[in-house]
């Protein structure tokens, strides 16, 4: 860019016509000529002596005024004689004794040009041409500089290309005829994270074909994609939610999160499509969709209800617990647990998704990793201590207790769809009867903290032993005092006990 700025004045200097040596310097010991002198400046004289003679015509108050005379100073003659004729004045100059005697200056007429005019127009044309040329050259230099800047910016957005090398060659290789299960099983022994090695992740990402959009939200879109004939889910984050993509990618690539009730991670990548950078998170695909969508269309029997809630509790317990050893993991709190962030699998179990707000804690270092994400959880599922801002943000157990509150609300959503004695409630979100569809922070704070309301328990639940047990369990998740709430492990054990008692009842029958 600096080179382009330095070149511009040089080009203009080259393009401008350079004056001759005769114009630059006055003559040494100039020769004087006798000239005819007519007009007011001559007085009583009819001749004068000077370096140049002239004859002029000007218009003054509508009258033509003719004058003749001489220039005694070289520079004065140079300035005047070089001036092109105008509609109001014309000057003709010459050198030689009495040379202006027979010269009569004429004003320019339409269609007639004078040598001075031609030179003037030529000079102006050359100046304009040189400026246009310089501007075009500068525009070209700017274009090249912008292209380089864009390329450099793209490289910055893809830091793994620099660290691990580009993968263009890998795409043409046979990753090969391996299935995703083969790749993921192999990756368990090759690192501490849940995902594939970075290069394989990027290879898989570049080979995915997007087939259909299966969901849209505030933070992006979810697509069904295909990789070597297998369905995968591709979550495309919006640019404003880059922090969530980065957090989830970081967590999956550094923590061993492989569990049947946690959404299976495959790969993560930054890719450029339609001249914009897209943030991809590639996971297992579950065609039955989210628990939120599933419950609106499906009623549950006792077995399927318990299978769903027990699988969610198992996934949450796995997140909350810290596992030590080479295949270990830190304790993790989800912070945005809700029915929309839980997916239903073909076997009737569920898996927890969306770890963009997750918090990690390691007991050995006592380090709390909250991440750097300005996004907050879903207001409808916020615990009282979050709504009244009394949560201890430097205590990891506080975040786990927030998850338990949200789990109790999900448990209530599921239990409403369980049929007992031929009766079942329509699906409704928590607090549907006391807050609007998109409640504000203040709406939820008043209902949960000030009025201390909880979701309504229908009377018909108390005629069914399973629903009665679930009602008791969810109430223990909704204590106003966070430390009084159950732990995820305690909930899992209680649900397992309820499930076992149901199996025993079937056996006895």
Swiss-Prot record:
Compartments where found: Membrane
- In UniProt terms, what is the effect of altering residue 375 to P? In FOP; variant phenotype
Please name the catalytic residues of this protein: 336 (proton acceptor)
Q: Which Gene3D superfamilies match?
A: CD59, Phosphorylase Kinase, domain 1, Transferase(Phosphotransferase) domain 1
The protein's Enzyme Commission number: 2.7.11.30
| Domain GS as annotated: residue spans | 178-207
Provide the glycosylation site positions. Answer: 102
Q: Which residues bind ATP?
A: 214-222, 235
Q: Name one GO molecular function term.
A: transforming growth factor beta binding
Q: What is the effect of changing residue 356 to D?
A: In FOP; variant phenotype
- Asked if the record carries the keyword Transferase, the reply is yes
Q: Identify its membrane topology class.
A: Single-pass type I membrane protein
State what changing residue 115 to S does. In a melanoma sample; somatic mutation
Oligomeric state and interaction partners are given as: Interacts with FKBP1A. Interacts with FCHO1. Interacts with CLU. Interacts with type II receptors AMHR2 and ACVR2A. Interacts with BMP7. Interacts with GDF2/BMP9. Interacts with BMP6 (when glycosylated); the interaction may induce HAMP expression. Interacts with TSC22D1/TSC-22.
Function description? Bone morphogenetic protein (BMP) type I receptor that is involved in a wide variety of biological processes, including bone, heart, cartilage, nervous, and reproductive system development and regulation. As a type I receptor, forms heterotetrameric receptor complexes with the type II receptors AMHR2, ACVR2A or ACVR2B. Upon binding of ligands such as BMP7 or GDF2/BMP9 to the heteromeric complexes, type II receptors transphosphorylate ACVR1 intracellular domain. In turn, ACVR1 kinase domain is activated and subsequently phosphorylates SMAD1/5/8 proteins that transduce the signal.
> What is this protein called in UniProt?
Activin receptor type-1
| Organism (species) | Homo sapiens
Protein encoded by which gene? ACVR1
